[in-house]
UniProtKB/Swiss-Prot annotation:
Organism lineage string: Eukaryota, Viridiplantae, Streptophyta, Embryophyta, Tracheophyta
Pfam families: PTR2
Inducing factors: Up-regulated upon nematode infection.
Family annotation (Gene3D superfamilies): MFS general substrate transporter like domains
Cell compartment(s), UniProt: Membrane
Tissue specificity note: Expressed in shoots and roots.
Transmembrane stretches, start-end: 53-73, 83-103, 109-129, 148-168, 190-210, 221-241, 315-335, 357-377, 401-421, 443-463, 482-502, 526-546
Residue positions where Phosphothreonine is found in the record: 108
Keywords assigned by UniProt, alphabetized: Membrane, Phosphoprotein, Transmembrane, Transmembrane helix, Transport
Organism: Arabidopsis thaliana (Mouse-ear cress)
InterPro entries xrefs: MFS_trans_sf, NRT1/PTR, POT_fam
Family to which the UniProt record says this protein belongs: Belongs to the major facilitator superfamily. Proton-dependent oligopeptide transporter (POT/PTR) (TC 2.A.17) family.
Gene Ontology MF annotations: dipeptide transmembrane transporter activity; low-affinity nitrate transmembrane transporter activity; tripeptide transmembrane transporter activity
Descriptive protein name: Protein NRT1/ PTR FAMILY 5.12
Superkingdom to which the source organism belongs: Eukaryota
């Protein structure tokens, strides 16, 4: 009996030519030669390009909309941006659980894309609502409350859709590669590199096009373009449906395949606590021969949970130290669309007497660095490293992550030094009390920190994707990628929290805060130095945990 997409958790394996634990869109066993691998992931990558064009068309210049169109202060605007980015990056944990437990990745992609498109449409509508005052009045006192309410509803509807779409699309794309096939297994490592390459194309394009439209034509048009792009993303994804492989989630868990992964993992910890008085000899006979040797205290749970659930809990628990260390990188990651952008808005951005570069467009250098460095990494660095280390990926994923964190430290140091020079230039030209004046210092001074930020992304972000996808059992891979994305989400929350606390602490007794609306009196340089110190601690701990980490599969 064949199965359908809606019931893709089941299926039969009928011959060696079929891909194990995989069916096509009609529910028949997937044929290796006509499905999956690059022919399928190409469609998901194209959908990623269009989706990232939409998302970063909103995210990269959002702080400008908050401060100029809605009249918010720099600190409040930065906090609002961080809260929204954090929500969008944290929601994959929930959607990943729903996809792994109930809907499956394909149906979750369809559902969340509808939320996404509705949110973008509503955002476009909110931007068409005019202000209630003339140019002489302050913007914040005359913005329509209806406009603000619709805007925030739209913004978080976008976050709801984006959070599920991206985690399931990435996991679905990786599912197209069969780990049991040597060639496809090797290609999967390259898949994460080229996926990030494709994503960067979408991000670069929208920063060049959409940000310019928003600041020079209209916000309504600047938000309508991302809405159309998201519609294109859904169309491109559906275009590849006949080539896709749909995971049947095999591996001996048919009886419990719809359990919520959080419930399963929690059940293991509860059972281990209840059976804490049991001796190892009481449980060793119940464990399979391939049981991992780490976190042996969880083996006691096998008395009331099955061995597969115990292994799932061990796999997730082993990721926690790396996840915690990576949160600091998430905080650093939050700075480019917020304070980096505001920093650039005060500097000389003129290309000619009539043309100025939007401050948000400087983020293009992050994307350019990624686009240039990923081919170098994949085609030059990896083969050389592979010949030395004999590892398929050249270096381990944790070595890759550690390298990226180290580069982020240098990026923060450079950002602090450039900000110190910008403040000195403002003082030298008597601009300290002129918040709207252009500091006579070229915005090109910011380019090195953006480029280094992009190179660190190639190491850390791609490494985190591959690490969290590969180190969890197959049935938890949406959740694995959700854990990776939650690093960015919680990093944004932590950044927002830090900004609020520092703003409160440094503005007492009439002092000028680090994040004053007048950036010529503020001290973003102090904040960057603080992040450099925190990143240094994160780097030390990551290297420590990387040395003792036991991979679930050869790296």
């Amino acid at each position: 009996m064949s199965t359908s997409i809606g019931d893709n958790e089941t299926g039969a394996i009928v011959s060696n030519e079929n891909v194990e634990f995989s069916v096509d869109f009609r529910g028949n066993p997937s044929i290796r030669s006509s499905s999956g691998a690059w022919k399928s992931s190409g469609f998901t990558m194209c959908a990623e390009v269009a989706e990232k064009f939409a998302y970063f068309g909103i995210a990269s210049n959002l702080i400008t909309y908050f401060t100029e169109a809605l009249g918010e202060s720099t600190a409040v605007a930065a906090s609002n941006v961080n809260l929204w980015l954090g929500t969008a990056a944290f929601l994959p944990l929930i959607w990943g659980s729903i996809a792994d437990s109930f809907l499956g990745r394909f149906r979750t992609i369809l559902l969340t894309s509808s939320f996404y498109i509705m949110g973008l449409g509503l955002l476009t509508f909110s931007a068409t609502i005019p202000s209630l005052c003339n140019d002489q009045e302050t913007r914040e006192s005359c913005v329509s409350q209806v406009k603000v309410i619709i805007f925030f509803c739209a913004l978080y509807l976008i976050a709801l859709g984006e959070g599920g779409f991206k985690v399931c699309l990435r996991a679905f794309g990786a599912d197209q590669f069969d780990e049991q096939d040597p060639n496809e297994s090797k290609a999967k490592s390259s898949y994460f590199n080229w996926l990030y390459f494709a994503i960067s194309i979408g991000i670069l394009t929208t920063r060049l096009v959409t940000n310019y439209v928003q600041e020079n034509l209209s916000w309504a048009l600047g938000y309508a373009i991302p809405c159309l792009s998201m519609m294109l993303a859904l169309f491109l994804f559906l275009l590849g449906i006949k080539t896709y492989r749909f995971s049947t989630g095999g591996e001996g868990r048919q009886g419990k395949k719809h359990d919520n992964p959080f419930v399963r993992i929690g059940r293991v910890f509860v059972a281990a606590a209840r059976n804490r008085r049991q001796t190892p000899s009481d449980t060793c006979l119940l464990l399979p021969n391939e049981s991992t040797k780490k976190f042996r205290f969880l083996d006691r749970a096998v008395i009331s949970c099955d061995s597969y659930e115990v292994e799932e809990a061990k796999a997730v628990l082993s990721l926690i130290p790396i996840w915690l260390c990576s949160l600091v990188f998430g905080i650093v990651f939050a700075q480019s669309p917020t304070f980096f952008t505001k920093q650039g808005s005060t500097m000389d951005r003129s290309i000619s007497s009539t043309l100025q570069v939007p401050a948000a467009t400087l983020q293009c250098f992050i994307s350019l660095a990624i686009l240039v460095f990923i081919p170098i990494y994949d085609r030059l660095f990896v083969p050389i490293a592979r010949s030395i280390t004999r590892k398929p990926a050249g270096i381990t994923t944790l070595q890759r992550i550690s390298t990226g964190i180290f580069l982020s430290i240098i990026s923060m140091v450079i950002a602090a030094l450039v900000e110190m020079k910008r403040l000195k230039t403002a003082r030298d030209h008597g601009l300290v009390d002129s918040p709207k004046a252009t500091v006579p210092m070229s915005v090109c001074w910011l380019i090195p920190q953006y480029i280094l930020f992009g190179v660190s992304d190639v190491f850390t972000m791609v490494g985190l994707q591959e690490f969290f996808y590969g180190e969890v059992p197959p049935q938890l891979r949406s959740m694995g990628l959700a854990l990776y994305l939650s690093i960015i989400g919680i990093g944004n929350f932590l950044s927002s929290f830090m900004v609020s606390v520092i703003e409160e602490a440094t503005s007492q007794s009439g002092q000028v805060s680090w994040f004053s609306n007048n950036l010529n009196q503020a001290h973003l340089d102090y904040f960057y130095w603080l992040l450099a110190c925190l990143s240094s601690l994160a780097f030390i701990f990551t290297v420590y945990f990387a040395k003792s980490y036991l991979y679930n599969s050869p790296k």
